[in-house]
Swiss-Prot record:
It comes from Ethmostigmus rubripes (Giant centipede). The keyword Cell inner membrane does not apply. Transmembrane segments: none annotated. This is U-scoloptoxin(04)-Er1e. One of its GO terms (molecular function) is toxin activity. Residues 1-24 form the signal peptide.
Amino acid sequence: MTRHLIFAAMLLVCLFVCWNAVGARDARSAFSLEETAQDEHVMEERVFINPAGNREKNACLENCKSLPNCKNYEFCSK
């Protein structure tokens, strides 16, 4: 009888640990999706605040400036 109780307790502990692991993974993915949505919103605001100009070219220049070995912006004019 004692063995059965120990087995049942271990089974419940395993179920609890697995359930929490799945819940934590779902929470992390939900947080990641929310973070991505916020990043997209910031980019939209940045494009909106930036007056006139070519949006693609501005984004290209920003990306190029962040690269350490970018010497010129010729490819941005395409």
